[in-house]
């Protein structure tokens, strides 16, 4: 029987400055244009893109809010750790936005791309997010508890 992802564990790719801000708790909202929606309370593993190329922590999904670009900026912009201009540039050409409200941010010892490929042979950093299967999550968790 194949272990099908249940939308409770996912990896999301972010630029390093935003990834670090999430795991430190400074950034509590992540905005996206179009993205598959995880289950509420899902654990979102934070992958920092180049030059870091590692999972550096996780946070839990408290809520998903979808709506008008202007409304979401007004409501959550202060928690997003980005400028209004960056936000406007990202959402240029669309009227709808999705906000992930994050809680319980946890930095971890970085898990690099080679280690991620040991968990999933064809692992590629996701464009938006990728679901994890139960056995993949277990392997990821075991790597977070290993002593260097």
From Swiss-Prot:
Residues 13-70 form the ASCH domain. It holds the Pfam family ASCH. It comes from the Bacteria. Active in the presence of Mn(2+) or Ni(2+) ions. No activity detected with Zn(2+) or Co(2+). Keywords: DNA-binding, Endonuclease, Exonuclease, Hydrolase, Nuclease, RNA-binding. Changing residue 47 to F: Significantly reduced binding to ssRNA and ssDNA, and impaired ribonuclease activity. This is ASCH domain-containing ribonuclease. It comes from Zymomonas mobilis subsp. mobilis (strain ATCC 10988 / DSM 424 / LMG 404 / NCIMB 8938 / NRRL B-806 / ZM1).
